[in-house]
């Protein structure tokens, strides 16, 4: 496969990594053209075994295009990551068309669901690590960003916090 874009996702890209944070590497790739001409389906993700340091997975270009059409918020995050490991000219061209597919409604549903899920998973226990509060606050702030600006939110927690209006 040929990698078109490789970025960091997760707490490192959000700006609140802890000493024990792993590297969440995400990438977009293209397979040999023969794979796209097959009648049977070819797996459209690559997932490497996760360990304490690395969590690496990627999406095939065809899957990426389908997800763009559906305004997948995770895809928008990957393309706005402040930590880029590899980037081809494809990434710039892709970013130029992404805005046409952004849906505030789909993004709001995604981030509200993420905040609720993270709240249930991380904050309803006796002992809560400080970092876990950020896992709830970040999607809440991204919702505020989307409501105020109508654009995809930035990856960095700091930017979501600084560039949204305070609560009345």
List PLM regions with ranges.
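Helical scaffold of the NTase/Pol beta-like nucleotidyltransferase catalytic core
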Residues: 1-7
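Residue-level detector of short, conserved catalytic/binding motifs and their immediate flanks
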Residues: 4, 23, 134
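Short His-Asn-centered micro-motif
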Residues: 8-10, 57
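Catalytic metal-binding acidic patch
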Residues: 10-51
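Short, solvent-exposed loop/turn segments at secondary-structure junctions
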Residues: 11-14, 31-33, 120, 141-142, ...
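Conserved NTP/Mg2+-binding pocket subregion across the NTase superfamily
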Residues: 47-144, 148-149, 161
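Short, charged amphipathic alpha-helical segments flanked by flexible coils
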Residues: 152-162
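Conserved small/polar residues in nucleotide/adenosyl-binding loops
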Residues: 163-168
């Amino acid at each position: 496969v040929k990698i078109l874009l490789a970025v960091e996702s997760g707490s490192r890209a959000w700006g609140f990594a802890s000493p024990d944070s792993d590297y969440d590497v995400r990438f977009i790739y293209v397979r040999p053209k023969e794979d796209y001409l097959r009648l049977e389906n070819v797996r459209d993700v690559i997932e490497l075994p996760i360990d304490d340091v690395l969590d690496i997975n990627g999406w095939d270009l065809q899957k990426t295009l389908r997800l763009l059409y559906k305004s997948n918020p995770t895809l928008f995050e990957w393309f706005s990551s402040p930590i880029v490991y590899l980037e081809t000219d494809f990434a710039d061209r892709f970013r130029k068309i992404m805005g046409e597919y952004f849906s505030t409604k789909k993004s709001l549903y995604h981030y509200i669901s993420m905040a609720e899920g993270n709240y249930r998973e991380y904050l309803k226990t006796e002992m809560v690590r400080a970092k876990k509060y950020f896992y709830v606050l970040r999607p809440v702030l991204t919702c505020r960003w989307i409501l105020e600006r109508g654009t995809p939110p930035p990856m960095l927690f700091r930017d979501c916090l600084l560039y949204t209006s305070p609560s009345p």
